[in-house]
Regions:
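Canonical P-loop GTPase G-domain recognition
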Residues: 104-126, 302-361
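Cofactor-cradling patches in redox/metallo enzymes
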Residues: 14-16, 21-123
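Extreme N-terminal, non-catalytic leader segments
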Residues: 121-175
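Conserved C-terminal guanine-recognition region of P-loop GTPase G domains, centered on the G4
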Residues: 221, 267-332
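Flexible, glycine-rich loop/tail regions that form catalytic "lids" or insertion modules at the edges
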Residues: 52, 138, 360-539, 803-804, ...
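Nucleotide-state-sensitive switch-loop elements of NTP-binding domains
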Residues: 158, 162-173, 179-184, 188-270, ...
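Flexible beta-alpha connector loops of hexameric P-loop NTPases
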Residues: 35-39, 62-64, 227-243, 286-289, ...
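Catalytic alpha/beta active-site cores
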Residues: 65-67, 441-708, 712-713, 731, ...
Length: 973
């Protein structure tokens, strides 16, 4: 019997670009291959361990953020250590893998490298063909006794006669089976039990997971410990779980495992799962089980030794648990748990019982404890649906206005016209330097400007003075002048002339290297606006000396491990007169604390510091994956930081709700807008429930959107401002500037093509125009080379030109502040996009809001569906990309220029500096980290404690210390 193909799919350490990896997994499954996706941010050791335990026939690696040469070398070495030196390894990474690197990679041991413009489906079919033709067979070429455990389990699955029932281990481990409906949280519960086993014992544990999609390993974040063995078993529709698992479990009992946990597939009501082939069973359920009659039908509920009701955060869980207890026997144990919460007391109690029944020698005093509070009260979970209702009521209120209301609106419009209206009459105007000023209430207002051809045009465009009342009502309710509610055309009345919207993204290698680039970009600009890109190690809360990660040091951004790195990074800048953007999310509070501590050392006044830091954890869980901790403590830390900075650093924006990375993950423009605004409104709910003043903290919000090529990007900023304004004023009662949404834009990285990259210059210029016409508050324009390298200095200056030429050379933005406002086409598109956003709000509301929707995989599912749709459109030619699938030149040559790479010596220097900092501050760091943990497990402000901790501890040390008391982020698919 031929074994089925089994692929391990992963992305390397500090690489969260999982869109392609997830797509490959889906395609492999569609082609009938067993695909085990183990996730993103995986070390070479973790990939090799998974490949060994799963007895994979091939490995597929998707790598997109550099460092692949060194990483793949480590992977080949790790595979040889696992006796997998012959396993086929396939690698893809867009333009980041260069053509000249293919031969060295294949010489290293990589089977094949895939590059654009090859379609993913073609690549997958090619991989399958290569593996089918491959003479390699890890299992069949060896005797059963000499095979690894992973290979033995494969052999047993193919020929059950190999199953050993020997008595060489008289004290057999206790085998526990876990059954229950799909979605009960069995995988998370098992993983948390594994953690407690590792903490309290010195033994080893095996986990067997039966699943049609082989997807459970993704959530098992503790399975990579050397004392854990995990095997996934595919049980398809109609297949017998017991037959598939019996011989495998029997074989595992012949190895020195102290405990074996077996997860069954999701069960129907009359099914007993694996209960007949294990020593004892645990039935997992949730409070959402239906009626009591349903309980009587649950076969495993009546026969299991332990009953677990997971998802205790369900509002009726206590009442529901009392009902369930009436249906179980006195001999059955019952536990109410919340497995997703690190240190959950219910899971601790469950583990104690399981350990006792399994005769494990444990130390319960070492069990983690926590007491997380829900970020949003249950009675507030309909906020998005209520906001949609508020929007609809707002527009409906203008449909049947009373005469006195119409008179008020007419008077309001007349006042606006008297201030800013221009009808061509130049009398009574003062003219200076091509600007006509009107005297109103002792104030001179610039109402017209003279073009290069001598035509006078209004500074603010608006309806004619004698416009109909219907036109005026629509104008004031949906548009209005820039800087006035509902802020459709802009958060401010005028574009700033003393400060261009340029905020170029820079970061590379060592802090001093990036510092040099900053000074280059700031040259000629009176008030510099710096945007800082960090390397992937920093983004994942790791240090440059992290084991197995040297390839990532300084790649794609600057390496910042300590406060000393932060001092080097901004050396020579007057931070009180510099606006600094920090592109950081997971470890954002740590980086922000380092920035403040460094500024304090330099003598800068915190109250004069200006800038933005992203801090948005929602989009990490929805799209980008740079998260370190579970959601609840992450939100607590963010709220601590916002609360602290509102007072201590009042001119700083402590959170930038980001849609850009959602778009980069594959969301369409409407999804990006809707998800981002929903996230922003969720932060409002979180901070409001904390007792903070909505009027004040919303002033500190900023947003970050893509500016792409699709039609909807013509109005994305306009619609964002309008939806936000109506929600904030009409629903939350905000009267001040918090209702005026401010946002940064970046041209679409996803739209850039590695094939014929010079076309990217045109793409970026088009997208810059979209952003500027949306009146973005700041803008980063990508370099045309960014699909395959970090931009050189000339590339950055060229990218800056794509926004400077429209601003300086064209007249689009120098005369009329709202040039396109009132266009019939744009107005229709605005309304259509707004309605589409409302529909998505309602979908999220049906999930219970953003947080439950994250847990239910709503966002990732929606994004992946969009990715599949786009991939299909590109494949069949429905969507045309110049140079890729339409009008290709068939030239593979790239523009000349050196590829920007970080020298090995620079990486070594950074690693050595970090090690020296740690050694120098060893004792002080130990004490400060202990104090930080004490605050993190109490009610204190963790961010305030961080500001002290960063004086002596590194980013990685802080991440590890908080993970010990808060737990680690658990991905899902």
């Amino acid at each position: 019997m031929n074994r089925p193909l089994r692929f391990i799919i992963a992305t390397p350490i500090c690489d969260g670009h999982d869109v392609a990896a997830a797509a490959i997994t889906r395609i492999l499954r569609g082609e009938g291959v067993e695909a085990v996706y183990i996730g993103f941010n995986k070390t070479a050791y973790q990939i090799a361990k998974a490949a060994s335990e799963e007895d994979a026939t091939a490995i597929a690696i998707s790598t997109y953020n550099g460092g692949h040469m060194a990483f793949l070398k480590e992977l080949v070495k790790a595979l040889k250590q696992q006796a997998l030196g012959n396993i086929p390894i396939f690698v893809g990474g867009g333009g980041t893998i260069l053509e000249k690197e293919i031969r060295p990679l294949m010489k290293l041991g990589i089977t094949k490298v895939y590059r654009p413009p090859l379609d993913l489906l073609d690549a997958v079919r090619d991989m399958i063909g290569i593996v089918n033709d491959h003479s390699f067979s890890q299992s069949s070429s060896q005797s059963f006794a000499s095979q690894t455990l992973g290979q033995k389990l494969t052999s047993i699955g193919l020929s059950p006669k190999h199953s050993l029932h020997g008595d060489q281990w008289p004290d057999l481990p206790r085998v526990w089976g876990f059954g229950g409906r799909g979605g009960a949280g069995k995988s998370t519960l098992i993983d948390e039990l594994v953690l407690r086993f590792l903490i309290t014992t010195k033994g080893s544990i095996a986990v067997v997971s039966a699943d049609p999609t082989l997807g459970d390993r993704l959530r098992m974040i503790h399975c990579y410990n050397p004392r854990v063995f995990m095997r996934s078993v595919r049980v398809g529709p109609g297949e017998n779980t017991t037959e598939k698992l019996q011989s495998i479990i029997s074989e595992l009992t012949n190895h020195q495992f102290s405990l074996i946990l077996v997860e069954s597939v999701g069960l129907g009501q009359n099914e007993l799962g694996v209960s007949s082939i294990v020593d004892a069973s645990i039935f997992c359920m949730t409070p959402e089980y239906g009626t009591d009659i349903q309980l009587e039908k649950e076969a495993l509920l009546a026969t299991s030794e332990i009953v677990v009701m997971n998802k205790r955060d369900f509002p009726q869980s206590e009442a529901r648990s009392r009902r369930v207890k009436q249906f179980i026997k006195p001999s059955q144990k019952f536990f109410l748990t919340e497995a997703k919460h690190f240190g959950d007391p219910g899971v601790n109690s469950l583990f104690d019982e399981l350990a006792t029944l399994s005769n494990l020698n444990t130390n319960s005093s070492l069990l983690p404890t926590s007491n997380f509070v829900e970020a949003i009260p249950f009675n507030r979970r309909n906020y998005l649906g209520e906001i949609v209702d508020v929007h609809q009521n707002y527009y409906a209120s203008f449909e049947n206005l009373a005469p006195e209301q119409l008179n008020d609106i007419q008077a309001e419009f007349k006042q606006i016209w008297d201030y800013y209206g221009f009808d061509g009459d130049m009398s009574n105007l003062r003219i200076e330097n091509g600007i006509a000023f009107k005297q109103v209430d002792n104030t001179e207002i610039p109402i017209a400007k003279k073009t290069t051809t001598g035509i006078w045009v209004p500074t603010i465009g608006m309806p004619q003075k004698n416009a109909s009342i219907n036109e005026i009502v629509r104008y004031l309710s949906r548009q209005n002048i820039p800087g006035s509610f509902p802020y459709t055309e802009g958060a401010y009345l005028y574009r700033r002339k003393d400060q261009d919207p340029i905020r170029m993204f820079a970061g590379l290698g060592l802090p001093e290297t990036t510092n040099y680039r900053f000074h280059l970009l700031a040259k000629g600009h009176g008030s510099p606006r710096l945007s800082t890109a960090f390397d992937s190690l920093t983004l994942y809360g790791l240090d440059s000396d992290e084991a197995g990660a040297s390839a990532k040091v300084g790649e794609g951004g600057v390496a910042v491990d300590s406060i000393e790195d932060m001092l080097r990074l901004y050396d020579g800048f007057d931070l009180e007169n510099t606006s600094v953007s920090l592109t950081m999310n997971g470890p954002a509070p740590t980086i922000m604390a380092m920035y403040l501590a460094a500024a304090k050392r330099k003598g800068f006044n915190w109250k004069k510091l200006r800038g933005t830091i992203q801090t948005d954890i929602f989009k990490e869980l929805q799209a980008q994956n740079e998260a370190q901790f579970p959601l609840e403590p992450s939100l607590r830390l963010i709220a601590d930081m916002i609360e602290y900075m509102m007072i201590a650093v009042p001119s700083w924006y402590p959170i930038s709700i980001s849609g850009y990375h959602i778009g980069e993950a594959g969301a369409n423009p409407v999804q990006e807008l809707a998800f981002t605004l929903a996230n922003g409104l969720t932060y409002v709910e979180i901070l409001k429930s904390r007792g903070l003043d909505v009027e004040e903290f919303t002033k500190k919000f900023s947003f970050f959107f893509t500016s792409g090529s699709e039609l909807e990007f013509n109005v994305l900023g306009r619609v964002a401002r309008r939806i936000w304004a109506v929600a904030l004023r009409e629903y939350y009662g905000v009267k001040g500037s918090g209702a005026a949404l401010k946002f940064h834009s970046q041209t679409s990285g996803r739209s850039l093509q590695d094939t014929e990259p010079l076309h990217n210059l045109t793409r970026v210029a088009l997208q810059a125009e979209h952003a500027l016409h949306n009146n973005t508050n700041s803008l980063h324009t990508n370099s045309y080379k960014e699909t395959y390298t970090t931009p050189e200095e000339d590339d950055v200056l060229l990218a800056m030109g794509s926004q400077q030429i429209p601003l300086v050379e064209s007249g689009d933005f120098g005369y009329i502040e709202n040039l396109n406002q009132g266009s019939y086409g744009l107005s229709y598109l605005e309304d259509a996009v707004e309605s589409a956003v409302h529909r998505i709000f309602n979908e999220i509301n049906m999930q219970g809001g953003v947080i439950p929707a994250i847990e239910n995989e709503y966002f990732r599912t929606a994004i992946q569906e969009e990715v599949q749709k786009e991939r299909k459109a590109l494949r069949n030619g429905e969507r045309k990309i110049i140079g890729l699938n339409y009008l290709p030149s068939n030239s593979s040559t790239r523009p000349r220029g050196e590829l920007v790479q970080i020298s090995t010596q620079d990486k070594k220097n950074q690693i050595n500096r970090t090690k020296f900092f740690k050694q120098t501050n060893k004792e002080k760091a130990k004490a400060s980290l202990k104090e930080l943990q004490a605050v993190a497990t109490s009610d204190g402000n963790v961010f305030e404690a961080l500001i002290k901790t960063v004086e002596y501890a590194t980013v990685g040390q802080i991440t590890s210390a908080l993970a010990e008391v808060w737990g680690k982020f658990r991905p899902s698919m």
